[in-house]
UniProtKB/Swiss-Prot annotation:
Known catalytic reactions: RNA(n+1) + phosphate = RNA(n) + a ribonucleoside 5'-diphosphate
Molecular function via GO: 3'-5'-RNA exonuclease activity; magnesium ion binding; polyribonucleotide nucleotidyltransferase activity; RNA binding
Name recorded for this polypeptide: Polyribonucleotide nucleotidyltransferase
Species: Synechococcus sp. (strain CC9902)
Main location: cytoplasm
Subcellular location: Cytoplasm
Gene symbol of the encoding locus: pnp
Length: 721
């Protein structure tokens, strides 16, 4: 198995590219290695299916737990469906690749990245993105690459290129930028309320680094003697497009310029124009070229009409500065926000509406045991904040089967989750696990940013003490040559017919999340900077409207939310609280009707719907873990009696024993002659033996009731008070 390995020196590290050794039947394959991380990426092309009018591209990212020396924890001990983070990596590969394929391509394309080995110092996702470009070029697929991706972190005041997992966790920025020689094609970022200028600088820093990887790919192709296949659009028959442009331009423009009409009226108006065109074509002579072309292809008329509508709408924006709903380029749609729209049995709820986009978000508070365990390669195995996004078909007036969440739903949910994470309270001050669910009730663009706004409303209604409220806006772009217009708060038709979908979320202080997808082959960082800066006043305007609904987190939780008490104990005493076989902690939970979680760090969290019960459980645990010293005095009750002595509960959950010889100064024949179960006594700690057992005494300790001294002729002793 011969192969060729080439090395790239990149930011002080060595990236190794091995070609010709693995997956010989794939169209193109490359093993990308850095440190001990190794990702095999393949690209394969097969003949397209009939009737396809889109690019059938599939990007998969496969994780194997053997890459980290682990065996899956499932019953079958085999990897099941891809975990959420693997799905997000699939999208991370797909988003910069898709705009670089020619729009006319209809062949089935599949890119598969498999993580074979993982070094925690070198995350695999950006290697997979760069590897996807290399494999595609090696496969000879028409592609406007090379393309590469890097991650940028921020530690203190310094940008870090391709940081480790630990550095990502510690830093204030986690930004992935992908680009070509022409410009940026994809950005994905989470930030700790960073100013716009810092984020733009980070994008520029990453884009400059990408150029080295692009040059390395060009060198690789040259060394292998492979010529890149550049997309060349096939000649299209312009008969139908030319006919529609002549017959329908005026009618379409009239519909698009009715700024006061509703989305439904505009859609119906365009459908009517298309129907008239179809009727006119059907009335043409049978040998007419237009009629014959439409008859030979069921989708030709629809696609040509859609292309003409796109062209006219873009011209209206570029020339007149007017959008289909009459807004200016930097104008936000009408905003409506409400908090507490559902009964308090739902811990928190918020309803956010922007134009025809409406999102209902709910917040649920849970206990530490409700945290999501992540069985994947990522070193962070637990999630304390979860956001789930649902997009039912009725939100766009359609019918289709309701199935489990797809990649889009998972991706949108993760973006809204990322936007909120930086403003969540610290675990020590608010130990709840929080789940937010965003139900998209109506969609006309920017539902993910609507979910961010809805999440903020729901969390504040639930009483979660956010560091700052967060809002979001989606920006768009229309580009024809050097003529560029940036659109604020794009709606569905502008997203579909535009060149960019750029989502920006953040607080008044700065950005918390960023996501940019392009439909063109690259955008200069300078234009991106304009979009980021134009998004800020839009975000703040939306935030102002949200704060009119609820200006701060509620001071009290829902009566149906669990009450949590959190405190710290010595980690070495965790075993004392748990007890042999878990008997001690089980007894505490049964006695107090609470739920108790103990972390390895010693943080104890008690959950209960009754605050008094939680406090009782806390006292018991504190008693179990409190250090007892010789000579200390305690008051407690007799819990049990054995022939050689009596046990006293000196602290909640902690007992000591009074030996029969320590019950009195006089000789005692029978323990019951002095005390019985339930008696309240004051004792002194006589000693703590080498096994940690607490030995107590009554001798010389004044009691609050009758004397414990035994008369020469023993008589029954009254209970001690």
């Amino acid at each position: 198995m011969q192969g060729k390995t080439q090395s790239i020196s990149f930011d002080g590290r060595e990236i190794r590219l091995t070609t010709g050794r693995f997956a010989p039947q794939a169209g193109g394959s490359v093993l990308v290695e850095c440190g001990d991380t190794a990702v095999l990426v393949t690209a394969t092309r097969s003949k397209g299916r009939d009737g396809i009018d889109f690019l059938p591209l599939i990007c998969d990212y496969e994780e194997r737990l053997y890459a980290a020396g682990r065996i899956p924890g499932s019953y079958m001990r085999r990897e099941a469906r891809p975990p959420e983070r693997a799905t997000l990596t699939c999208r991370l590969i797909d988003r910069p690749m898709r705009p670089l394929f020619p729009s006319w391509m209809r062949d089935d394309l599949q890119v598969v990245a498999t993580c074979l080995s993982l070094d925690e110092r070198v995350p695999s996702d950006v290697l997979a993105v760069t590897g996807a470009s290399i494999a595609t070029l090696l496969a000879g697929i028409p592609f406007n690459g090379p393309m590469a991706a890097v991650r940028v972190g921020l530690l203190g005041d310094d940008f870090v290129l391709n940081p480790s997992y630990r550095e990502i966790e510690r830093g204030d920025l986690d930004l992935v930028v992908a680009g070509t020689a022409d410009g940026v094609v994809m950005v994905e970022a989470g930030a700790n309320q960073l100013p716009e200028g810092d984020v733009i600088e980070a994008i520029d820093f990453g884009y400059e680094a990408i150029q080295e990887l692009i040059k390395a790919q060009e060198t690789l192709l040259k060394d292998l003697g492979i010529k890149q296949v550049k997309p060349e659009a096939p000649k299209e028959d312009t008969t139908v497009p030319a006919y529609l442009e002549k017959q329908c331009t005026k009618a379409i423009s009239a519909v698009l310029s009715k700024f006061e009409q509703s989305k439904e009226d505009r859609d119906n108006g365009l459908e009517a124009v298309k129907a008239d065109a179809a009727e006119a074509i059907a009335a043409l002579k049978e040998d007419d070229a237009v009629r014959q072309a439409v008859s030979s292809s069921s989708k030709l008329l629809g696609n040509s009409f859609k292309a003409l509508t796109k062209k006219l709408m873009r011209q209206q924006i570029l020339k007149d500065g007017k959008r289909v709903d009459g807004r200016g380029l930097d104008e936000v749609r009408q905003i409506s926000a409400m908090a507490g729209v559902l009964p308090r049995r739902v811990h928190g709820s918020g309803l956010f509406q922007r134009g025809l986009t409406q999102v209902l978000s709910t917040a649920t508070l849970g206990t530490p045991s409700d945290a999501q365990e992540m069985d994947d390669l990522h070193p962070n195995t637990e999630k304390l904040y979860l956001h789930h996004y649902n997009f039912p078909p009725y939100s766009v007036g359609e019918t289709r089967p309701m199935r489990s969440p797809g990649r889009r739903e998972i991706g949108h949910g993760a973006l809204a989750e990322r936007a909120i994470l930086p403003v969540l309270p610290e675990k020590d001050t608010f130990p709840y696990v929080v789940r937010v669910v965003s139900e998209v009730l109506s969609s006309n663009g920017s539902t993910s940013m609507g979910s961010v706004c809805g999440s903020t409303l729901a969390l504040m209604d639930a009483g979660v003490p956010l560091k700052a409220p967060v809002s979001g806006a989606a920006m768009g772009l229309i580009k024809e040559g050097k003529d560029i217009k940036i659109l604020t708060d794009i709606q569905g038709i502008e997203d579909f017919l535009g060149d960019m979908d750029f989502k920006v979320a953040g607080s008044e202080k700065g950005i918390t999340a960023l996501q940019m997808d392009m439909k063109i082959t690259g955008l200069p960082v300078k234009v991106m900077a304009e979009a980021v800066n134009q998004a800020r006043p839009a975000r703040l305007h939306i935030l102002e409207k949200m704060l009119e609904a609820i200006d701060k987190p509620r001071e009290t939780l829902s009566p149906h939310a669990p009450r949590l008490l959190s405190f710290r104990i010595d980690p070495e005493l965790i075993g004392t609280v748990i007890g042999p076989g878990g008997r001690t902690i089980k007894g505490i939970t049964e006695r107090t009707n609470t739920k108790i979680d103990i972390e390895d760090s010693g943080i104890v969290t008690i959950a209960s719907h009754d605050g008094a019960a939680a406090e009782e459980a806390q006292k018991i645990i504190e008693g179990l873990t409190r250090k007892v010293n010789e000579g200390e005095m305690f008051s407690g009750s007799i819990t049990r009696i054995i022939p050689i002595g009596a046990f006293v509960e000196i602290l909640p959950g902690k007992e000591g024993m009074i030996h029969i010889s320590q019950l009195s100064e006089a000789r005692v024949e029978k323990v019951e002659d002095v005390v019985k179960v339930g008696d309240e006594v004051t004792v002194r700690v006589r000693e703590i033996d080498n096994r940690g057992r607490i030995n107590l005494t009554l001798r010389g300790v004044p009691q609050s009731g009758e004397s414990t001294e035994v008369e020469p002729q023993p008589t029954p002793v009254a209970p001690l008070s």
